[in-house]
């Protein structure tokens, strides 16, 4: 089943702007548009601040019941999507299952760059209580590289006209100026940041400097022949980039089963724990350069991982890449076997010693590891003696196994839900049934034995 993508539109637009993308991405992704307050078919009763728009979106995602999802935000909707994503990753909004974010000419978390004269002109359009057809058409034409075809042009103009003037004004006066840039740290969710080549205030330079730095796993691209209204102007180009990003960067690695994901999203789990599990569940970047090891050493560690922690199915966790991150961040277990150098140096030496054996297939490597464990292997390279290599191999096996067990999908596979011992309330729910083979009503069904 395709992953659900919740789509948040631009100022003066609605979920209608994603119809073309929805058709083009059908079968890969299921796009679901959300009309933000005061736009499309949505009233402004829930409020028009960024916080209020974020809450509306979070509630819509929660009501949907989906447990694997992504966000797509265009212009104004990009700012909202960025806040929702950050509150999901830190666990504070009670959502779980975010896989990726796509931003189209997005308004940044910082105040949006906008020419003062243009802002004043746009405010003037709504001053008399409605945005007229001429003003709406002027807005659409000013935000496209060339005039849209008649049907999308008419829809885009209609969307501007039906925008509630108060919502339009509130964004220009307040929402676009709100500064959320210091509220959240860089977000590790895989992100695709797209800019229209002919956009003005939110063009390529603005996206590179204001949006991309917020995403530590972000990618950037420019869509030719487009200004600001990318989904209307270049739906094929935008869809192709999203599809490639999804297949190459996101659609791999295990997905947390729905019943476990719902427990993680529930009040039984603290925000801090939910945030940790959210980051652990993100897809790895298989083509990313290693941070602590060389590319050759990482390949050897991947071979070692296949032998030491064989994973079922065709969507494994990239354990080696996660251990590389662990080494780069200095997040070891605090123990070093007597006689071994620092963790990073020990890994480099141990992997260099096994490089030739790793190229001869997993079965051969498994036999070599057996000899190492028995203390019967004499390394010919890498700088470690037999005893040191034995100690390092044991340490590496522990690191790989820990990374595997830390993934929420693995926890589901081994029927572990001990993380759900109580949320952030004054009273922890805890567990009532502690006997063997006893399962509480809220617990996931568990893996088949």
Spell out what each predicted region is.
Residues 8-10, 74, 195:
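The conserved beta1-alpha1 loop
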Residues 32-72, 76, 83-94, 223, ...:
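Active-site loop/oxyanion-hole signature of alpha/beta-hydrolase fold enzymes
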Residues 86-87, 93-130:
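Flexible "cap/lid" loop of the alpha/beta hydrolase fold
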Residues 275-289, 301-393:
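Flexible, low-complexity segments enriched for small/polar residues
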Residues 23, 190-226:
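Conserved loop-alpha-helix segment in the C-terminal half of the alpha/beta-hydrolase fold
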Residues 226-239:
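Catalytic histidine-centered segment of alpha/beta-hydrolase-like enzymes
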Residues 112-116, 130-185:
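Conserved alpha/beta-hydrolase catalytic His-Asp/Glu region
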């Amino acid at each position: 089943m395709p992953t659900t993508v919740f789509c948040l539109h631009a100022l003066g637009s609605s979920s209608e702007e994603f119809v073309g993308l929805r058709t083009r991405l059908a079968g890969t992704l299921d796009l679901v548009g959300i009309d933000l307050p005061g736009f499309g078919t949505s009233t402004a009763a829930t409020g028009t601040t960024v916080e209020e728009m974020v809450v509306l979106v979070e509630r819509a995602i929660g009501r949907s019941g989906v447990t694997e999802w992504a966000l797509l935000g265009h212009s104004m909707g990009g700012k909202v999507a960025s806040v929702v994503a950050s509150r999901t990753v830190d666990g504070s909004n009670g959502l779980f299952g975010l896989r990726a974010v796509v931003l189209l000419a997005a308004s940044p978390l910082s105040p949006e760059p906008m020419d003062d004269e243009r802002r004043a002109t746009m405010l003037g359009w709504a001053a008399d209580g409605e945005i007229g057809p001429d003003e709406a058409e002027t807005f659409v034409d000013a935000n496209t590289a060339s005039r849209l075809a008649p049907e999308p042009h008419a829809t885009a103009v209609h969307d501007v006209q039906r925008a509630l003037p108060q919502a339009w004004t509130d964004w220009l006066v307040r929402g676009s100026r709100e500064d959320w840039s210091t509220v959240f740290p860089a977000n590790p969710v895989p992100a695709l940041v797209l800019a229209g080549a002919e956009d003005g205030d939110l063009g390529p330079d603005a996206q590179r400097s204001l949006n991309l730095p917020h995403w530590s796993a972000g990618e950037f691209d420019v869509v030719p022949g487009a200004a600001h209204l990318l989904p209307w102007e270049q739906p094929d180009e935008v869809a192709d980039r999203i599809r490639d990003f999804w297949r190459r960067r996101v659609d791999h690695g295990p997905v947390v089963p729905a019943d476990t994901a719902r427990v993680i999203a529930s009040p039984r789990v603290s925000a801090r724990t939910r945030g940790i599990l959210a980051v652990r569940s993100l897809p790895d970047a298989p083509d990313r350069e290693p941070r602590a090891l060389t590319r050759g050493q990482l390949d050897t560690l991947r071979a070692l991982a296949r032998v030491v922690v064989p994973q079922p199915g065709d969507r494994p966790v990239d354990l080696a890449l996660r251990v590389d991150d662990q080494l780069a961040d200095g997040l070891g277990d605090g123990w070093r076997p007597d006689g071994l150098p620092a963790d990073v140096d020990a890994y480099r030496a141990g992997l260099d010693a096994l490089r030739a054996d790793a190229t001869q297939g997993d079965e051969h490597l498994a036999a070599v590891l057996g000899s190492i464990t028995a203390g019967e292997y004499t390394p010919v390279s890498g700088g470690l003696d037999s005893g040191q290599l034995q100690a390092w191999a044991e340490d590496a096996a522990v690191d790989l196994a820990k990374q595997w067990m830390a993934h929420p999908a693995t926890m589901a596979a081994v029927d572990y839900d001990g993380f759900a011992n109580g949320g952030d309330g004054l009273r922890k729910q805890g567990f009532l049934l502690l006997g063997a083979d006893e399962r509480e009503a809220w617990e996931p069904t568990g893996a088949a034995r």
